[in-house]
């Protein structure tokens, strides 16, 4: 098992955007799996904590996020998924977050996004990046096996419910979510799929999602869910919002998106949500880090958003 000294060396190397060797990644993922196995589908989190949305392999913007929000472990973080795909540095991004989780398990919470899946990563870049950087798919397999263990949701001080996507018509209560068997590939449909794929919508009730997975849910649904479960807010990611954060559904729901200039061309700001000692909320917005020299990519990934 890597010692603290080994982990500190690996974290320093990763902060310079230098990926680890295959054997080191394997050992790191095994350690992370042992930690995540002990976490819950609804993982309790204490305040203060800083809540972050999609990162999508934009490594230098993750470093900028830590510069703006405070470094790990000095600041407690809760990441709501989508660490990989689309950006140029999915390997370095996800390895750094997993290494921080192993080193400072109580200081950082990492949830599962819809891109933390075998099927999606084979289309949107992470699989190809692993092949390019390691010459085989082993590292992709270590990480996608680990993704099955990531918690689906988190609950900050029993008040703020955090997850990647949104609500499910199959899940009325947090106890329903606690009862799910999460240790599997993200299904194509059903409650676990919905948590990672659904979106809030201006229309009331449940709707068919244009994404082809999950549902859209109206303000009435969010209000009822919050009331039933004693919540003040649903915090989620999963959608590009131009200011980095967006309140909707009469402030029952907030979207947080933490990949600035998404896909290196969308022109959006990023944001993170600081939840303070007294559960006060503060958004920090940030622009992209200075552009680095872009690596040659061997395959163009599809343009449409997932």
Curated annotation (Swiss-Prot):
Mn(2+) 2 binds at residues 82, 114, 164, 238. SMART domains: PP2Ac. The active site is at 115 (proton donor). Its cofactor is Mn(2+). CDD domains: MPP_PP2A_PP4_PP6. It is found in: Cytoplasm. InterPro entries: Calcineurin-like_PHP_ApaH, Metallo-depent_PP-like, PPA2-like, Ser/Thr-sp_prot-phosphatase. Its main location: cytoplasm. PROSITE patterns: SER_THR_PHOSPHATASE (PS00125). The keyword Isomerase does not apply. Pfam families: Metallophos. One of its GO terms (biological process) is mitotic cell cycle. Keywords: Cytoplasm, Hydrolase, Manganese, Metal-binding, Protein phosphatase. It catalyses: O-phospho-L-seryl-[protein] + H2O = L-seryl-[protein] + phosphate; O-phospho-L-threonyl-[protein] + H2O = L-threonyl-[protein] + phosphate. Its EC number is 3.1.3.16. Binds 2 manganese ions per subunit. GO terms for cellular component: cytosol; nucleus. It comes from the Eukaryota. GO terms for molecular function: metal ion binding; protein serine/threonine phosphatase activity. SUPFAM superfamilies: Metallo-dependent phosphatases (SSF56300). Mn(2+) 1 binds at residues 54, 56, 82. Belongs to the PPP phosphatase family. PP-2A subfamily. This is Serine/threonine-protein phosphatase PP2A-1 catalytic subunit. It comes from Oryza sativa subsp. japonica.
